[in-house]
Amino acid sequence: MTEKVKKISPRRRARECAVQNLYSWAISKNSPEEIELNFIVDQDNEMKGVDMPYFRKLFHQTINHVETIDSTMAPYLDRDNVELDPIECAILRLAVYELKFELDVPYKVVINEAIEVAKVFGAEESHKYINGVLDKIAPALSRK
């Protein structure tokens, strides 16, 4: 039996890299520039096929708007965001950034991409939690 190999889109790769960098930023509190540089150096081969301008925009703009993003998320979380798994928090922050500021990206795409990224990086059931939270946030941002 042959396995179907899925080609990952450059934007999905950008989101995955942005989540990894947001996670590093939240854990280390190093500067975004330092995190990005170290990531690119460490992941040189993995950066092929990444929409680099979109990756940089997602990573830096999510950090620039983190207070707004966190206050947008807070009413829809079942716990404080500091109690969230750091990967779940990074995925949610990125998705809320896209829902709130990247209006050219359909909300269904944002939610689906967040779920798919959670399946790669999150805990076993985290994609379900991410989906539930984003399904509540999207209508509140008039994205449904």
From Swiss-Prot:
Gene3D superfamilies: NusB-like. It comes from the Bacteria. SUPFAM superfamilies: NusB-like. The keyword Mitochondrion does not apply. GO terms for biological process: DNA-templated transcription termination; transcription antitermination. Keywords: RNA-binding, Transcription, Transcription antitermination, Transcription regulation. The keyword Transcription applies. GO terms for molecular function: RNA binding. GO terms for cellular component: cytosol. Pfam families: NusB. NCBIfam families: nusB. Belongs to the NusB family. Involved in transcription antitermination. Required for transcription of ribosomal RNA (rRNA) genes. Binds specifically to the boxA antiterminator sequence of the ribosomal RNA (rrn) operons. This is Transcription antitermination protein NusB.
